[in-house]
Amino acid sequence: MEFDPTKINISSIDHVTILQYIDEPNDIRLTVCIIQNINNITYYINITKINPHLANQFRTWKKRIAGRDYMTNLSRDTGIQQSKLTETIRNCQKNRNIYGLYIHYNLVINVVIDWITDVIVQSILRGLVNWYIANNNYTPNTPNNTTTISELDIIKILDKYEEVYRVSKEKECGICYEVVYSKRLENDRYFGLLDSCNHIFCITCINIWHRTRRETGASDNCPICRTRFRNITMSKFYKLVN
């Protein structure tokens, strides 16, 4: 089932945008609350409203090594303090439609979305978030700002993510030679991207390599091409998507 932008209803309460995706023939109703952080030009998504269990899973994941490493790398890459990568709106009468745990959209697209067992909801959530970001990053070239991003632009953006995801599913780690997405442990199903080259590694193997090199006093070189690297970025995809 494909994401359909015509099924979106948009409303807002205070500084929160509420997106409702309603597909009655297929019995799908998904509500996504989004906060735009003007200072950092980024977005925070309410995972409590998507599914209350996701918030508890996220808090548990964040305490694990993979979660701590991911949060550290995301903070470094975005320039946002770790404590500012999440926001909470309290549950009270005034906030009953928007309360919950809001997390940086990167965490939703690359981490939390994999905890949703319904693949159709996964696909629609990814499309909904990317659609919203595409619309809000688009600057209309009209005096009254009435033009919105075209259907073709939306399709191109979604196609890019789907293509990267499709290719990522087949990629093998250059150290253990296992398909990254097929690894037994969920925390191992991430790529470790080097800033020096495009060789593919799972996050676990490249972190072990990095730690061993440091412990022995060796330089941080790619295990394959030996090009020196400075940073390892944890990612759900085999390459960064711009």
Swiss-Prot record:
> Which PROSITE patterns does the record match to this protein?
KILA_N (PS51301), ZF_RING_1 (PS00518), ZF_RING_2 (PS50089)
Q: What is its main location?
A: host cell
Enzyme nomenclature, EC number = 2.3.2.27
Give Gene Ontology CC terms. Answer: host cell cytoplasm
Top-level taxon of origin: Viruses
Q: Where is the KilA-N domain?
A: 21-131
Q: Zinc-finger: present as a keyword of the record?
A: yes
> Can you cite a GO biological process for this protein?
symbiont-mediated perturbation of host apoptosis
Q: Report the subcellular localization.
A: Host cytoplasm
Q: Which SMART domains match?
A: RING
What are the boundaries of the RING-type zinc fingers? 173-226
User: Can you tell me which family this protein belongs to?
Assistant: Belongs to the orthopoxvirus OPG021 family.
- Return the protein name: Host range factor p28
Taxonomic lineage: Viruses, Varidnaviria, Bamfordvirae, Nucleocytoviricota, Pokkesviricetes
